Amino acid sequence: MCQAGEDYAGPAQREPPPVPRPSREQKCVKCAEGLPVVVIRAGDAFCRDCFKAFYVHKFRAMLGKNRVIFPGEKVLLSWSGGPSSSSMVWQVLEGLSQDSAKRLRFVPGVIYVDEGAACGQSLEDRVKTLAEVKRILGNTGFPFHVVALEEVFSLPPSVLRRASQEPAGTEEAYKAAVDSFLQQQHVLGTEACASPAQGQGQLRPSHSQEPSGTVGHPKDAQTEALSRLFKSIKTLTAKEELLQTLRTHLTVHVARSHGYRKVMTGESCTRLAIKLMTNLAMGRGAFLAWDTGFSDERHGDVVLVRPMRDHTLKEVAFYNRLFGVPSVFTPAIDTKAPEKASIHRLMEAFILKLQTLFPSTVSTVYRTSEKLVKAPREGCATGPSGPNCLLCMCALDVDNADSATAFGAQSSSHLSQMLTAEAGTPTRPCCGAGEGQTQSCHRAVGRREDAWACIIEQLCYSCRVNMKDLPSLDPLPPYVLTEAQLRSQRGSVSEEIQEYLIEEEEEEDRAEPCEAMKQEAEDKGIGL
């Protein structure tokens, strides 16, 4: 029987058991001698030296297992000032030191993109942040490039074109490059012994030979244009995606301009697990292998690599704390945003809360991403000759003829909106009575709709959804609009000349009668 005042609430959720702290009797799980100072997982307590060896080995193993970076290559380190990218720069700095057992063999540089205008920072705060950034990067000894995000308004349209890529090196080619590099270092070492004054400068990485690129104050017009662009976007999800896209375009442009073949990013295992779930929710499932894999070759001549993808955020925080890795705090575009403000924030809260209850959540999602293979869909055009998304540069793997897909439904919706707009257009002129002004507003509206359709048809499904939150194309950087127009013109010219080209089947059909006539003439003894 039910009783008044009876509490029918469910049982209260139990909080996860606290992580056991290392006691005085507990020893390091690696050396079994030192006192543990860090507990990564339950039962995995490391002393200071063993934790450092464990952390460094992860970084070196990720680079050595993939063998994407060849000796002597110029590598650009994308540094945001956060914990993961700061730890990555620190690992490279220690790997190039003379005390390292196995020295890294590439030539590094660092890039920092100032995103203060997009995040709403004041000019005074940006100046203070840049001063701290230059101080930290100056202590590394690497050539660094500090650029403002406003410079995207002066980028060339070639940034959105996939450059020609050399074929991937084989195992033998990598070994040959290592042997050649070691011989070169041996020759330099011999010369250094003969003339120590001259050889001492040659043994060290030539960081001072390339001038460091620093940013001045960006133009007020560009700062205002960038602020207007991000203020016009309705949702935080679209803002974060556009910010990431513009940052990547600017980084790739700087890498190409200064001869860098690889770009290192500091995305950790935890961040990649969140990114995988976020991209799935945003309709980017076809590009997960590129967005979360070790290497990303979508730009062709510049390859993005993620050497920190095996480190969790917890390990990164412990390492930076124990060994004093410097970093710079800069507010992001989603700072102080509520949990449900964007898909990124929602997925981040979901993964991190699940990780507190089930400590294997991040590793499980991460291991799933490792199994993804960069195999395009059957019948999909890929590579330099195939169409790529105008913004994210991924292959357009959508099927325009399949109306059952979400992409087809989106295209049908866009077409119906255009037909509705045309049906509602008044027949009489509305812009003055002059001959030259008749129906000028309708022509302007038609041009805007044509430009919008030109942009939309060159985007993947995820970028199309995000572009819905942009009410107008006017705030976009000029290089995006210019490249969209050039692609549309090239497509129109290709369609016009297509009917004059002889296809392979027609050429074979024409070749068969010629071969038959030639064979018949040979049988009759007549030479053709």
Curated annotation (Swiss-Prot):
Alphabetical list of SUPFAM superfamilies matching this protein: Adenine nucleotide alpha hydrolases-like (SSF52402)
Subcellular location(s) per record: Cytoplasm
Residues bearing the modification Phosphoserine: S416
Modified residues (N-acetylcysteine): C2
Acetylation keyword on record: yes
Record has Transport as a keyword: no
Pfam families: CTU2
Pathway given in the UniProt record: tRNA modification; 5-methoxycarbonylmethyl-2-thiouridine-tRNA biosynthesis
Signal peptide: none
Region (Disordered): 1-23, 196-219, 504-528
Gene Ontology terms for molecular function: nucleotidyltransferase activity; sulfurtransferase activity; tRNA binding
Basic and acidic residues compositional bias, start-end: 511-528
Family: Belongs to the CTU2/NCS2 family.
Main function: Plays a central role in 2-thiolation of mcm(5)S(2)U at tRNA wobble positions of tRNA(Lys), tRNA(Glu) and tRNA(Gln). May act by forming a heterodimer with CTU1/ATPBD3 that ligates sulfur from thiocarboxylated URM1 onto the uridine of tRNAs at wobble position.
Subunit record text: Component of a complex at least composed of URM1, CTU2/NCS2 and CTU1/ATPBD3.
Name of the protein: Cytoplasmic tRNA 2-thiolation protein 2
